[in-house]
From Swiss-Prot:
PROSITE patterns: PRPP_SYNTHASE. This is Putative ribose-phosphate pyrophosphokinase 2. Its cofactor is Mg(2+). It catalyses: D-ribose 5-phosphate + ATP = 5-phospho-alpha-D-ribose 1-diphosphate + AMP + H(+). The lineage of its organism: Bacteria, Bacillati, Bacillota, Bacilli, Lactobacillales. The gene is prs2.
Length: 326
C-alpha cells in the first residue's frame, strides 16, 4: 500500500465524471480524496459544497470533460470558483480527457474555435495550471496563458506491447488517418517497428476506398489513434489491413468514448484486442475485446512532481529492457 504523502498542504478532489480514475490517482499519490459534495437540482443547476478547509492549500481537481460534456464542464467551473472563494493557494485542474479539444481551428467559414473558448473560461475562473492526457491537438496548450502539462500515453502502450512480444520488424504500427502520423511514428520507434498509413482518395466519407502507404503483408498491425469515438475509423481500417494481408490487427487509443453504438461496430471488425486508458468512464456498452490500461500512476507521478517542483521530462519516455541508456 502506498504510504501517506507527507505534505498535507496538497489536496485532491474528484468531481463526478470519473471517480474510479480519481480514486486510483489518490491511492498512487498517497493523498486521500478531499471531502466535497456535488448535486444537480431538478432545473439542471449544479451546487457544490467543499466539506473541509482548503485555505492556503494547493488544490488539484480531477474531472474528465466527457459526456455529458457541458454538465461536467460547468461542474468543474463551479468547483474552481468554490476553491478560489475558499482562499486556496493554487487551483490546478487534472483533465484525463479534455472535451472540445477537437474544435481547435476554423475548419469551415463562420465556425468557432471552441477549445480556445473553453481555455478562456477555465483561465478566467482562476486556475493556475492544467494537467491533461494526450490532447487531440497539442497546439491547444497554446490556448492557455498558464502552464499546461500534456502527458503522453504512448510510453504506456509501448511498455504493454513490448511485454506482449509485439515489437520488431514483424509488427507494423499503422495510423488510420494521415493526421496521426506523428503518434504512430512515436510508438513505432519504441517498438523498433516500421509504420504504415491509411490514406483516402478524397475524404473520410468513403472509408472503404482507403489505401495503405507502407507494407503490412504478413505482419501484425497495431492501429493507433487518440480518441475512439464511434469505432468506425478502427473498424474500417482493420478491414483494409485484413484485405492487404496483415495477419492480426490490434488497436490502441488514449481515450475510449465508445459513443453511438461503437461496441456493435467494433465487435464485427477483425480486431484481436483494443487497448484504451481509463481516462473516460463511459456508460455505453464496451466491446468484449477491450482492455483498459490505467493512466493513474502516470498522472499521480505528474501531480507529485509538479507539487515538489521537479521536472516532468522522465514521464515522457519509456526505456525498453535491454536497450542501452547511455
Amino acid at each position: 500500500m502506498t504510504e501517506r504523502y507527507a505534505d498535507k498542504q496538497i489536496k485532491l478532489f474528484s468531481l463526478t465524471s470519473n471517480l474510479p480514475i480519481a480514486e486510483k490517482i489518490a491511492k498512487a499519490a498517497g493523498i486521500p480524496l478531499g471531502k466535497m459534495s456535488s448535486r444537480q437540482f431538478s432545473n439542471g443547476e449544479i451546487m457544490i459544497n467543499i466539506e473541509e478547509t482548503v485555505r492556503g492549500d494547493d488544490i488539484y481537481i480531477i474531472q474528465s470533460t466527457s459526456f455529458p460534456v457541458n454538465d461536467n464542464l460547468w461542474e468543474l467551473l463551479i468547483m474552481i470558483d468554490a476553491c478560489k472563494r475558499a482562499s486556496a493557494n493554487t487551483v490546478n485542474i487534472v483533465l484525463p480527457y479534455f472535451g472540445y479539444s477537437r474544435q481547435d481551428r476554423v475548419a469551415k467559414p463562420r465556425e468557432p474555435i471552441t477549445a480556445k473558448l473553453v481555455a478562456n473560461m477555465l483561465t478566467k475562473a482562476g486556475i493556475d495550471r492544467v494537467v491533461t492526457l494526450d490532447l487531440h491537438a497539442v497546439q491547444v496548450q497554446g490556448f492557455f496563458d498558464i502552464p499546461v502539462d500534456n502527458l503522453f500515453t504512448v510510453p504506456l502502450f509501448a511498455e504493454r506491447y513490448s511485454k506482449l512480444g509485439l515489437s520488431g520488424s514483424d509488427v507494423v504500427v499503422v495510423s488510420p488517418k494521415n493526421s496521426g502520423i506523428k503518434r504512430a511514428r512515436s510508438l513505432a520507434e519504441y517498438l523498433d517497428s516500421p509504420i504504415a498509413i491509411i490514406d483516402y482518395a478524397q475524404d473520410d466519407s468513403e472509408r472503404e476506398q482507403g489505401y495503405i502507404i507502407g507494407d503490412v503483408s504478413g505482419k501484425k498491425a497495431i492501429l493507433i489513434d487518440d480518441i475512439l469515438n464511434t469505432g468506425k475509423t478502427f473498424a474500417e481500417a482493420a478491414k483494409i489491413l485484413e484485405r492487404s494481408g496483415a495477419t492480426d490487427t490490434y488497436a490502441v487509443a488514449s481515450h475510449g468514448l465508445f459513443a453511438g453504438g461503437a461496441a456493435d461496430v467494433l465487435e464485427t471488425a477483425p480486431i484481436k484486442e483494443i487497448i484504451v486508458t481509463d481516462s473516460v468512464k463511459t456508460k455505453n456498452r464496451v466491446p468484449e475485446n477491450v482492455t483498459y490500461l490505467s493512466a493513474s500512476d502516470l498522472i499521480a507521478e505528474a501531480i507529485i512532481r509538479i507539487h515538489e517542483r521537479r521536472p516532468l521530462s522522465p514521464l515522457f519516455s519509456y526505456q525498453p529492457k535491454g536497450k542501452n541508456n547511455a
